[in-house]
């Protein structure tokens, strides 16, 4: 049976030629490792952390529970504030994710550095929270939907906006009009000849705890999630580029698994030792 995942070129020798291709050429790139942390009355900021807000309500409707929530019903997008009846907070397992990653804009550098661009990126981290009593039991709240219901898993989110400056190529600030039949609509307008941005992100919750906040004469408590964020940012332009090529890729005929022989296919797979004993480079 052919392995469709290992396509090999039958040609032992290839003739290398120069070919012109349309490519996404990277002009500037960087990586950042950010520790995002809410700062409450008991936290001393330090250079290793970036301040973010406490958890906000991500439900479509407000939530209420006069026994624990501060200030009446908590409306969507408001900070989830509660009193000292809540003794702990926890994330619902497997609910944390980057819900939205958006390049807000790419603009010429505000300090006038030629070829550099300011990139504004907004992250939205979504997750579900449990509020816990002194015994570790979940405290319910009422979701004020058209059919009100008690819930213990509360949808919440945190946002973070990053601003970085990257080289994006020196170009005149003309408007570039492009017609491409690959897309619909065909016509696009790039005002100012701005480079394109590509952003990749990986985030994980590091800790979740109760933060103490003094609002006026009132002390209230919030769910504070510390987040570790890895980001790679690239600025690129679509260009014509001359590259060395060995010709077109070979595409062999697919050899599908025949009905009735799943065991033959399974038995041909290598044993996944690394899944049982993950390798390590530590000595």
Can you describe what each PLM-predicted range is?
Residues 1-283:
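Viral structural modules
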């Amino acid at each position: 049976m052919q392995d469709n995942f290992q396509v090999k070129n039958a040609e032992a020798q290839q003739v290398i030629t120069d070919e012109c291709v349309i490519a996404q050429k990277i002009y500037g790139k960087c990586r950042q490792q950010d520790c995002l942390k809410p700062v409450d009355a008991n936290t001393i900021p330090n250079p290793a952390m970036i301040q973010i807000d406490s958890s906000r309500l991500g439900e479509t409707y407000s939530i209420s529970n006069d026994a624990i929530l501060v200030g009446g019903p908590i409306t969507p997008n408001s900070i989830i504030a509660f009193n000292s009846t809540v003794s702990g907070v926890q994330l619902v397992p497997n609910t944390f994710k980057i819900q939205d990653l958006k390049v807000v804009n790419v603009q010429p550098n505000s300090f006038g550095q030629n070829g550099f661009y300011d990139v504004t990126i907004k992250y939205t981290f979504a997750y579900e929270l449990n509020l816990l009593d002194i015994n570790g039991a979940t405290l319910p709240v009422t979701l004020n939907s058209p059919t009100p219901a008690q819930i213990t898993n509360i949808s919440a989110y945190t946002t973070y906006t990053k601003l970085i400056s990257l080289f994006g190529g020196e170009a005149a600030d003309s408007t570039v009009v492009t017609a491409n039949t690959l897309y619909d609509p065909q016509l696009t307008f790039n005002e100012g000849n701005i480079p394109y941005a590509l952003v990749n992100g990986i985030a994980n919750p590091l800790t979740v705890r109760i933060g103490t906040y003094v609002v006026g004469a009132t002390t209230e408590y919030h769910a504070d999630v510390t987040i570790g964020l890895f980001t790679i940012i690239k600025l690129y332009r679509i260009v014509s580029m001359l590259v060395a090529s060995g010709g077109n890729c070979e595409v062999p005929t697919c050899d599908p698994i025949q009905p009735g022989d799943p065991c033959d296919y399974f038995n041909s797979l290598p044993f996944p030792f690394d899944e049982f004993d993950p390798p390590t480079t530590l000595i």
